[in-house]
Design a protein with these regions (language model features):
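P-loop NTP-binding core
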Residues: 1-292
Length: 292
């Protein structure tokens, strides 16, 4: 690692849900961008081998720093590939994005880590510990399945946040994610803490009504009730739902297609403001926990 700068007290946040398609990669993009714009040096690590975060960060093609030999049959990870973090002696050089964030990306081949002896997860933890001294925040976009890669992301993290949609499979993914977090906390990382859940793509019927009294559609309201039940069963209350991000279909589709955050593409849009508020809430919660 050739980054030379004063030591920082880096905080690692893993973004995870045991269900794909919950806007995990885009929200990782939004939160990390907002952290950087707020003056916090931020590193993004894509640990979902579907590479959604990586592909939207580099919509014009995969950089050679992530995949050195893309046209050959053999896998040749570059120095900015997440794969390298699972080894104790590899060169790691994050890509510096135009907005100031640093980025370590992935490709499908990261899945190969799941067939290695599971002690590689501790090499990963050591490499992330070394990176923490260079950053204020490290945002890890985790994968939605219990595996070496998923466990590694959690044993290296300080905090977990869980995005979800208001529908059955997504809230069930929240329940599984919290169960896995508690298992990993008990066996590997007792310092791991749950910051909260945030609802993505919320379709609001009436902003003037209370959460369970008509703000959302009847189906979404029932799913929210069940999400609250899941939290209660895990020992948490409704305050752990940190944000309800409104769904603006055209803005969302166009921003994602262009590889932009909402703040870059439509800074006055409701989702841009809500992700900014969520980011500030995360900072406040972490600072409060550190003071405590």
């Amino acid at each position: 690692m050739s980054i030379n700068q004063p030591s920082k007290l880096g905080t690692v946040i893993v973004v995870g849900n045991q269900k794909g398609g919950v806007v995990k990669s885009q929200s990782s993009n939004e939160i990390s961008y907002n952290l950087q714009q707020a003056g916090h040096k931020t590193l993004c690590i894509d640990m979902d081998w579907t590479a959604g975060f990586t592909e939207r960060t580099f919509p014009d093609g995969m950089p050679f720093e992530i995949e050195r030999e893309p046209l050959k049959h053999e896998f040749a990870p570059g120095s900015a590939h997440t794969y390298q973090l699972f080894f104790s002696d590899t060169v790691i050089e994050p890509i510096v994005l135009p907005d100031g964030r640093h980025f370590i990306g992935t490709t499908y081949e990261l899945n190969e880590i799941n067939y290695r002896p599971n002690d590689c997860i501790f090499d990963f933890k050591d490499r992330v510990e070394a990176l923490k001294s260079h950053y204020d925040y490290i945002i890890i976009d985790s994968n939605p399945s219990y595996s070496n890669v998923m466990v590694a992301s959690h044993i290296a993290a300080d905090y977990l946040i869980v995005p979800t949609l208001l529908e059955k499979s997504s809230r069930n993914g929240v329940a599984k994610q919290l169960a896995y977090m508690q298992k990993i906390k008990k066996n590997y990382n007792p310092a791991l803490e749950f910051l909260g859940v945030y609802v993505t793509q919320a379709v609001v019927s009436n902003y003037k009504k209370d959460l369970l009294e008509g703000r959302f559609t009847a189906v979404d309201t029932e799913n929210l009730r069940m999400l609250f039940e899941i939290l209660h069963n895990c020992g948490y209350d409704e305050s752990k739902v940190l944000a309800y991000i409104s769904y603006v279909s055209t803005t969302a589709k166009e921003a994602i297609e262009l590889g932009l955050t909402f703040k870059e593409y439509a800074p006055t849009s409701l989702p841009a403001k809500q992700y900014d508020e969520l980011t500030q809430k995360l900072i406040s919660l972490i600072q409060g926990a550190n003071r405590g």
